[in-house]
From Swiss-Prot:
Similarity comment: family membership: Belongs to the bacterial ribosomal protein bS1 family.
GO MF annotations, alphabetized: mRNA binding; structural constituent of ribosome
Main function: Binds mRNA; thus facilitating recognition of the initiation point. It is needed to translate mRNA with a short Shine-Dalgarno (SD) purine-rich sequence.
One matching Pfam family: S1
Keywords: Repeat, Ribonucleoprotein, Ribosomal protein, RNA-binding
PANTHER family (alphabetical): 30S RIBOSOMAL PROTEIN S1, SMALL RIBOSOMAL SUBUNIT PROTEIN BS1C
The organism of origin for this protein: Rickettsia typhi (strain ATCC VR-144 / Wilmington)
Domain of life (superkingdom): Bacteria
Occurrences of domain S1 motif (ranges): 39-100, 118-184, 205-273, 290-360, 377-447, 464-533
Record InterPro entries: NA-bd_OB-fold, Ribos_protein_bS1-like, Ribosomal_bS1, Ribosomal_protein_S1-like, S1_domain
Name this polypeptide is given: Small ribosomal subunit protein bS1
A GO BP entry: translation
CDD domains: S1_RPS1_repeat_ec1_hs1 (cd05687), S1_RPS1_repeat_ec2_hs2 (cd04465), S1_RPS1_repeat_ec3 (cd05688)
Amino acid sequence: MSIKLKQRFVPQLAAINYQFEEDFSKMLKTVDTSHIKEKTVVKGQVIEIKNDMIIVDVGLKNEGRIPKSEFLSLPEVGDVVEVFIEKIEGRNGRTILSREKAVKEELWGQLEIMCSKGEFVDGTIFGRVKGGFTVDLSGVVAFLPGSQVDVRPIKDPTSIMNIKQPFKILSMDKKLGNIVVSRRVILEESRSEARDEMLSKIKEGMILEGVVKNITDYGAFIDLGSVDGLLHLTDISWGRVNHPSEVLEFNQKVKVMVIKFDEKTKRISLGIKQLDSNPWDAIKEEFPVGKKMTGKVTNFADYGVFLELKDGLEGLVHSSEISWLKSNQNPRKMLTIGQEVEFIVLEVDTEKHRVSLSIKQCQENPLIKFAENNPIGTIIKAPIRNITDFGIFVVLGNNMDGMIHEGDISWEDNGTDLLKSYKKGDEIECKVLAINFEKEQVSLGIKQLSPNPYQKISDEYKKGTIVKAVVTEIKDDGLVVLLNNKVTGFIKRVELSDEKDEQKPEMFQVDEEIDAKVVSIEKSTGRVLLSVKAHKIAERQKTLKEYGSSDNTTNMGDILANVLEEKK
């Protein structure tokens, strides 16, 4: 059953308000209805409620129908309501009205006024879209860009959704129906006053409570209410912390101390470890240098391994202090996390908060024992562990190796070629040549088991001796010569003459005899190095010394001419 009003309703513009409903019809008779246009808001009277529809008369030829769902509270027959005219005459000749759009039009007008005055509007974030969020402004949907959500990135946006909160309108476009709002502007304005007030009270040494707002590799930012402070990684604990996330969580409440405040930049440095006494104050007494202790492996680094000395305190064993004989090996290959090892305290640096430890010094240095039993010159037998391009490694016991360089295999033959005649596992005899305790190396030799065949040559051809040499081979870099038909010598190109244009090997012939001075002897090969240039210079100096004291009128040319004549 429906209730219908018999009296016709006369149109009225939305701008006109009447105090009494009973005068409504009479007043409308004098109003010009030609102003009623589509896409405008007008007042209308509810004349009938039928099923799910509200029938409204706005004074036009036809009534309009509006779904009940568009009304927040249902009107009664006779009530005057504001409606939006979609079309004066739509399909079937009916006027198309909307209560929802009328409300939005009214709200849009209110929002425009608030925007022009810079006033805040209440809204609720209810959805996520590309680039930001959607906000319900009591029926009008606005866009909240991601950059305008907060003063800092928010990891969990659900914490600010579906909550009524203030926003500031940044821009409005009625034609496009777009509204852009900001939450960040309000936060900045509200925080600004509180920030200035708090900064005026901040002092170093203050203890404050805050919330972890962001975690980075180098520390965490703590929200102190209206300002943020940085809690650096090194100020979290007196012990070792590899990453802040090991001990801190997002939104975790923490107690911190202001350890530094820069009044110019307004930067606040915070610390947690400063709330406790510095354990390093008593470290030197508790861990004296030379003390032998035990500890567990807690962490590895490229340069060594960390051991736990006690709760919250670690010491470093450098790679070179792990083993006497494996200083270059990866610590991870020698130790495991949680393994308990014995160590000695080497140094305690209270300023840098470092404790240096040694594992190897808890054990006897096997190299010292080897040196005591096998001094330099000792002949030993040892199996071959490995053969490389540059020599042979043999086993000396106690995980210790000795090395025979390829140059110490033979006096006369090529060591590189001789390496092929040895194989892994062969036991060979060799002599201890040198022991380097700093580098932890033992040098051995095979050729030193027999006398140096070139020592006799060194004794016979001493440096400075003038000898006669016969050319046996002409090379680009010099001449190969033979001394006394048994010893090989060599004259470098630059040693062929004291005149540069005569330093040419091709100027000599095979079997030509040359006078030269012994410069040196290669002990590894026994080859004698000679110099024609040095011999000529010595001859010239000798001549000048012999004839230089004669008549001063005699010139150099005369002296040399006389010498040459005498030699003929």
